[in-house]
């Protein structure tokens, strides 16, 4: 069996060869395996140097000060640390949090946990294009609101939120603003020296770095305080205890440095491939593009193929590695909660495919995906009585089904 073509770059990315080479220098006796906290000898000093360099590399990509970067095990931990950290530290100021229904589960489930601790959370509806209406956010703000958490780029539909406008609204109301940037770092320009953002979560494995590695930006001016969620040796200025994984950190730093050097050129190439993919589907009947196409990262295309059953479609196109939702929730047979929040029917949400292309995608792979999906969708529709009814001009939404 040949290996399927990988088109699921929003789920994870392969580690860049250059990143892997750097990481290997910090694992064995051939390189430097020291503990960065061992400040009494050469091995610790060299490891600490590597960690400091990586901290600068991550900070440089996003316009931050290196002292504002806190290492974590990934964006999920960063989201937890930011949201719980603010809620617990500033609980006397208020207990209300605002987020969006289309956020990643790492944000939604963290807010739900805080609700069990007697905090209150408001989950806003997005507009049908996936973007947040600022007026909806304005109306949700209360005197006891302490935090707004809105992701920069959605992991399923790839839309880019206007975090500058959202942040300005938060500043006007003296509310902390957290942004999950796992899907935007290296794809969208981020300058935290100018953006009104207090906390921002990052992931290494979404940007051709290693899994199990992330960071949280915590603003210093004006100073943002968070309560630690993990206790121990007081690492990361007391915000996140635990021995630093030097090789992972070096990998994340290198991945961010490569992204900074190559982002403009890479985005141009990926956008051309995405547009080629889109052009292959636009003339098909009953195809719906999910999410705003203007405010969107280059590599994402989320399409619903009406009158095709979701699981059948995913099985039919198993020669390409794609997803029908977030990788974190795709084991569920429920339709995507993100697409349902946009107002899509269960049927359309079920029949969606998320194509995400990246650094190693080729034109030949895009053409293969177009041909495969078109062929399989046509075949599945030929087997569908609903498709026959649609072709006969019957409005299926008005059909009254009876049980036997």
UniProtKB/Swiss-Prot annotation:
Enzyme Commission (EC) number: 2.8.1.7
A single BP term in Gene Ontology: [2Fe-2S] cluster assembly
Keywords carried by this UniProt record: 2Fe-2S, Cytoplasm, Iron, Iron-sulfur, Metal-binding, Pyridoxal phosphate, Transferase
Record-listed pyridoxal 5'-phosphate binding positions: 75-76, 155, 183, 203-205, 243
Modified residues (N6-(pyridoxal phosphate)lysine): 206
Essential cofactor(s): pyridoxal 5'-phosphate
Active site, renumbered: 328 (cysteine persulfide intermediate)
GO molecular function, one term: metal ion binding
Binding annotation for [2Fe-2S] cluster: 328
Gene3D superfamilies named among the record's database cross-references: Aspartate Aminotransferase, domain 1, Type I PLP-dependent aspartate aminotransferase-like (Major domain)
SUPFAM superfamilies to which the protein is assigned, alphabetical: PLP-dependent transferases (SSF53383)
Annotated pathway: Cofactor biosynthesis; iron-sulfur cluster biosynthesis
PROSITE patterns in alphabetical order: AA_TRANSFER_CLASS_5
Chain coiled-coil ranges: none
Reaction it catalyzes: (sulfur carrier)-H + L-cysteine = (sulfur carrier)-SH + L-alanine
Gene Ontology CC, one term: L-cysteine desulfurase complex
Compartments in which it is found: Cytoplasm
Functional note: Master enzyme that delivers sulfur to a number of partners involved in Fe-S cluster assembly, tRNA modification or cofactor biosynthesis. Catalyzes the removal of elemental sulfur atoms from cysteine to produce alanine. Functions as a sulfur delivery protein for Fe-S cluster synthesis onto IscU, an Fe-S scaffold assembly protein, as well as other S acceptor proteins.
Quaternary structure and interacting proteins, as annotated: Homodimer. Forms a heterotetramer with IscU, interacts with other sulfur acceptors.
Family: Belongs to the class-V pyridoxal-phosphate-dependent aminotransferase family. NifS/IscS subfamily.
Name of this chain's protein: Cysteine desulfurase IscS
Protein's organism: Ruthia magnifica subsp. Calyptogena magnifica
Gene name as annotated: iscS
């Amino acid at each position: 069996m040949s290996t399927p073509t990988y088109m699921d770059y929003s789920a994870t990315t392969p580690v860049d060869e250059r990143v892997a080479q750097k990481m290997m220098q910090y694992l064995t006796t051939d390189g430097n395996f020291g503990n960065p906290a061992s400040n009494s000898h050469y091995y610790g000093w060299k490891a600490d140097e590597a960690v400091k360099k990586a901290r600068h590399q991550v900070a440089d990509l996003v316009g931050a000060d290196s002292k504002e970067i806190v290492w974590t095990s990934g964006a999920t931990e960063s989201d937890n640390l930011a949201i719980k950290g603010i809620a617990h530290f500033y609980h006397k100021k208020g207990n209300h949090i605002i987020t969006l229904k289309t956020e990643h589960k790492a944000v939604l489930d963290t807010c739900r946990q805080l609700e069990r601790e007697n905090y209150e959370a408001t989950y806003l509806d997005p507009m049908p294009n996936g973007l947040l209406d600022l007026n909806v956010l304005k109306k949700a703000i209360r005197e006891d609101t302490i935090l707004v958490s809105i992701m920069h780029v959605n992991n399923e539909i790839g839309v880019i939120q206007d975090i500058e406008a959202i942040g300005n609204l938060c500043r006007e109301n003296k509310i902390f603003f957290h942004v999950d940037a796992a899907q935007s770092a290296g794809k969208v320009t981020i300058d935290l020296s100018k953006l009104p953002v207090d906390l921002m979560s990052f992931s290494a494995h979404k940007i051709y770095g290693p899994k199990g590695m992330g960071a949280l930006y915590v603003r210093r001016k004006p100073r943002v305080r968070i309560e630690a969620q993990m206790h121990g040796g007081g690492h990361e200025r007391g915000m996140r205890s635990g021995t630093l994984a030097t090789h992972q950190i070096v990998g994340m730093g290198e991945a961010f440095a490569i992204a900074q050097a190559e982002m403009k050129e890479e985005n141009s190439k990926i956008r051309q491939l995405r547009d080629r993919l889109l052009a292959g589907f636009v003339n098909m009947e009953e195809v719906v593009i999910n999410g705003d196409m203007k405010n969107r990262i280059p590599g994402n295309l989320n399409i619903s193929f009406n009158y095709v059953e979701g699981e059948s479609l995913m099985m039919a196109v198993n020669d390409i590695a794609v997803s029908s939702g977030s990788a974190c929730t795709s084991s569920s047979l429920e339709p995507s909660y993100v697409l349902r929040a946009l107002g899509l029917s269960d049927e359309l949400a079920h029949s969606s495919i998320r194509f995400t292309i990246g650094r190693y995608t080729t034109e030949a792979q895009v053409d293969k995906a177009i041909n495969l999906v078109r062929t399989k969708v046509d075949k599945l529709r030929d087997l569908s009585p609903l498709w026959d009814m649609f072709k006969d001009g019957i409005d299926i939404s008005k059909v009254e089904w009876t049980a036997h």
